[in-house]
Amino acid sequence: MWRVVTCALTSRIESTSHQPASPSTPTAMAGDTDTEAPHVVEDCRGVLQVLSDGTTVRSAAAPYAVEDRDDGRVEWRDAVYHPAHGLGVRMYRPPRREREGKGPLPLLAYFHGGGFCIGSRAWPSVHACCLRFAHELPAVVLSFDYRLAPEHRLPAAHEDAATALAWLRDRLTGMTPGLADGSGSDEDVRAWLAGSGADPGRLFVSGDSAGANIAHHMAARFGAAGAGLGPVRIAGHVLVMPAFTSEAPTQSELSSRGNAFLSRDVAERYSRLALPAGANKDYPLMNPLGPDSPGLGLVGGRVLVVVGGEDMLKDNQVRYAERMKAVGNDVELVVFDGKEHGFFSRDPWSETGSEVVRVVRRFMDRDAADLVQPADGQH
């Protein structure tokens, strides 16, 4: 099935200015006229700075402000899913009245954006997106962190995402004995998920930007049968402005504004920091349609691709949707005219953000409707 929906909304989001993280570019050290002090050579939105001596400086602050509307109705808690790497997950469940009497709820595994270099489940923007999804879909949402570049270049993020889905499988099915996870026992996590009414048969893998890239590769990794996830069924994939690049620039890239939220300069910086040594933007994890990438095949469940009409990555995103459909996948492409990259995560409470949530809900509700259709005389 192939459906294209164009959403034309009048609201426009302006990027928020942000001061670089400390330290600022240092001057030469006192008493040393021959050696220059380490200085900033790469800066990612003031959140990550790489110094000339190779060290990195990270700020805990988010690069843009998002209104805090956490009123406590959505219940959430943190856990650690990868103790060796210190990686956490934030788990959300709808208000109790949304859970009671409505049957099992779908699961939404969510991976944040940030060019594989910045981002956190704890960022207010990521937290707000997940609050909305949990309350309004409604769904049990799990927002996973992953290792970031340049300290951990690709494929570290994708390896962590696969570990995250396996961790979720084990906690939903009790396949591993309870072990301390750093913020409570596995038994606590299992009990929390069980009390959420989560349905292991309706898992949607999702993400924004770099996280949407991860969501695609989890679809490719686990395949149509959900191999390796046991009784957990992948019902679909929600890709919001996926970060797919290509070595050859596309028309949407060439025509993008220099002051866009995701400009060519910013995208190049992320690529320099995230790609493995010697790789270019056709690296298979960055370009699923590249010359060295495995062919696209059938994935578990349907695919939703959300695109901003002014996103410099638009052409690669649309081409991806077309190719996925051509090999037999059920793909829905939704284009938000006039919107730049990151329009949802930067302002999740806007009317545009509300429309994104409605699009995702309709997409997920289709799966619920399909499940109740009789097949071969059975339900």
Question: How should each PLM-predicted stretch be described?
Answer:
Residues 30-379:
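Alpha/beta-hydrolase superfamily serine-hydrolase fold, recognizing
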